[in-house]
């Protein structure tokens, strides 16, 4: 499988729009695509899937073992993909607190040439210094092409190309400023793909723009040589929560990693889905229930009125079924959730937890988790935390994890457990050890 990475000097440069437009344009050309998102982001992969028609995997060089990244890449090849298109996160060299786990690390690991998307809106000749610095910063990462974004005029484009010419890095195209290529945002990033009012028209317009302003034939010449990956079957995976896992899935519970489901299915686990917003209950024969993260704060009123959903979860918990919630799912397992307007909505009441968005506080970063006694997890884990919720009250039930940050500093214990019900704000990505 061949591939390349779309990256940028900083967030907000336009790499997501460029990636989506290229995915749709390459799909039109009949390419067998494997979309990838670097890092822990949940939202962009849904856009990648909409643009390409193919499931997008997160590949996270900080939180995932290298052999898992290789195995997931192998799985894409097994599924018939021939071209891996990766979108970076933040700036190319940005990662955890110590810089590890960057998009550049993923490009190096997978031997991907990098196409750098540069926001040119407020610069001309200075672009040469920026691109030269990025091309020289790490010799193990190849900047193979440049896409000029938000170019103001043909004169502006000529100045930019002239400044870059001595660097001998191909300029693959110049995209004009176009407000129609902006994606709507909210506090955790982009609005979810399923909530975009006219996503298909946006993707078609983005693809038309890429086909008009980017030399796709020149892009094809920089795709990396084929690379072999380790077989998925040889790589241990994260232990599943049960033999039949019922997963909440709708606009309130949309943040679940595709690689977790892929790994669990390969271990023979049955996965079924239900919609709390549709007032659906998990299947009675499930021996585990997973409430992933999402935006329950935007739907708290509907969740509070979802009687069948609430009764189904409470009944399962009473039978000793494993019930596990992450971030938004953790908040829903609590007693109440206060929305941004300060209105408190009753939740499931299975954990002594009250949360609020009336006074937002950012919690962000990679985490290493040591499961405590009674946790449904049995091995040290790598995870990510990203939310704006404030804890109003957290009871004295058993804690779930001992937590360290990305550089190893102890940040205390986190999560709650009462019987078979547990949860925390941490999004589990992979395990740290060598055995599942």
Curated annotation (Swiss-Prot):
Keywords: ATP-binding, Cobalamin biosynthesis, Glutamine amidotransferase, Ligase, Magnesium, Nucleotide-binding. It catalyses: hydrogenobyrinate + 2 L-glutamine + 2 ATP + 2 H2O = hydrogenobyrinate a,c-diamide + 2 L-glutamate + 2 ADP + 2 phosphate + 2 H(+). It is an enzyme of class 6 (ligase). The record marks 427 as: Increases nucleophilicity of active site Cys. One of its GO terms (molecular function) is hydrogenobyrinic acid a,c-diamide synthase (glutamine-hydrolysing) activity. Pfam families: CbiA (PF01656), GATase_3 (PF07685). Its EC number is 6.3.5.9. GO terms for biological process: cobalamin biosynthetic process. Its cofactor is Mg(2+). The a and c carboxylates of hydrogenobyrinate are activated for nucleophilic attack via formation of a phosphorylated intermediate by ATP. CobB catalyzes first the amidation of the c-carboxylate, and then that of the a-carboxylate. NCBIfam families: cobB, PRK01077.1. Comprises of two domains. The C-terminal domain contains the binding site for glutamine and catalyzes the hydrolysis of this substrate to glutamate and ammonia. The N-terminal domain is anticipated to bind ATP and hydrogenobyrinate and catalyzes the ultimate synthesis of the diamide product. The ammonia produced via the glutaminase domain is probably translocated to the adjacent domain via a molecular tunnel, where it reacts with an activated intermediate. Belongs to the CobB/CbiA family. Catalyzes the ATP-dependent amidation of the two carboxylate groups at positions a and c of hydrogenobyrinate, using either L-glutamine or ammonia as the nitrogen source. This is Hydrogenobyrinate a,c-diamide synthase. It comes from Brucella anthropi (strain ATCC 49188 / DSM 6882 / CCUG 24695 / JCM 21032 / LMG 3331 / NBRC 15819 / NCTC 12168 / Alc 37) (Ochrobactrum anthropi).
